[in-house]
Amino acid sequence: MNSNSIQSFDALPHNLRECFLDMASFLEDQRIIASTIIDLWSASYGKEGMNNLQDLASRNLLKLLPIGRNEYEDGFYNELLVKQDNVLREFAINQCLKESSSIFERKRLNLEIQDNKFPNWCLNPKQPIVINASLFSISTDDSFASSWFEMDCPNVEALVLNISSSNYALPNFIATMKELKVVIIINHGLEPAKLTNLSCLSSLPNLKRIRFEKVSISLLDIPKLGLKSLEKLSLWFCHVVDALNELEDVSETLQSLQEIEIDYCYNLDELPYWISQVVSLKKLSVTNCNKLCRVIEAIGDLRDLETLRLSSCASLLELPETIDRLDNLRFLDVSGGFQLKNLPLEIGKLKKLEKISMKDCYRCELPDSVKNLENLEVKCDEDTAFLWKILKPEMKNLTITEEKTEHNLNLLQLF
């Protein structure tokens, strides 16, 4: 590690220093989706996650690799990768070790289990194990048998599970993490991992964010957990197990949920009905789900929804007409929907709609009601822009921004 990097670390403000040290929770040689890190930081640093990433990058303490459009102002960070140099990661780990001579008193604790061999401090303890860390990271390899020991973790606010096995049982001691706010489960194996013992999450009164990456899961499992404090649910590259039976009303069960992100869930062909019952929802993003062919009519019940992102869903043919009931909708993204036939007939009723992103939607017909959308900004490609330019004389405040299609090789680093 060169002296410039050390000087950069020494000069960091306290909050950026903390953010840098948190990066040690992820495995080496990884390209991490920016949303993952921002979710992690949300437990301790609020909503400044993107600013912190950019500040650390400006000091050469990490690299930012865009894989798509730079529309971070909309709060969507799945199209940005973060890479940390392995030497910098080791430096961060060493700094964490200096926080306390006692493993149990460190602010951050990384537990690595290889070949089912636990560290010595886990074996035959003379007294119950109490972990006082606020950030706990557990990494296991593909041979892990999910055989856990008991421990008490009363102060853990953020939990990162780096897994590699095809089957993984969440440890029972998660239920002791009464202060837990963020759970991130990242599977580094070749195939989606089947998770079991999700019920240990149901007793966590402060859990606000859950992120699943590359796991096999039923979308019905989430409401069953009864997480009344959950604010954000994220699924990336997950295998979504079909559920035969829908749930009863979940509006009380998920009363705080404001944001759902579903990205690269390749076998998702339809959204579960319960999503339409989460009346607190403000952002719904379903992206890069190539089998999604329809959106449920009941989506019109989400009266507080402000952002609806249905981008790069290649099989999506139409949007439900009930979208015209989304009175608070400000941003609609259907970019990459090259099979989309038309926008909802009465989309012009959405008086708060400020921006539509519809790149590569050149087959989409625009209903006459779009003329009622005042101060509208449209982001699209050249061919789609032609559809809107025809309306320009009747839409004086219409802004059309043309974007070129770019092929970004950074995308290959995701897989």
Swiss-Prot record:
Query: What keywords are assigned to this protein?
Result: Coiled coil, Leucine-rich repeat, Plant defense, Repeat
- Which ranges does the UniProt record give for the LRR repeats? 229-251, 256-278, 280-303, 304-326, 328-351, 352-373
All copies of the NB-ARC domain together span 8-43
Against Pfam families, the record matches this protein to: LRR_14 (PF23598)
Q: Which residues form a coiled coil?
A: 239-260
Q: Which domain of life is it from?
A: Eukaryota
Q: Name one GO biological process term.
A: defense response to other organism
Instruction: Please give the record's comment on domains.
Output: The LRR repeats probably act as specificity determinant of pathogen recognition.
Q: Which family does it belong to?
A: Belongs to the disease resistance NB-LRR family.
Q: What does this protein do?
A: Possible disease resistance protein.
Q: What is this protein called?
A: Probable disease resistance protein At5g66890
Species the sequence originates in: Arabidopsis thaliana (Mouse-ear cress)
Phylogenetic classification of the source organism: Eukaryota, Viridiplantae, Streptophyta, Embryophyta, Tracheophyta
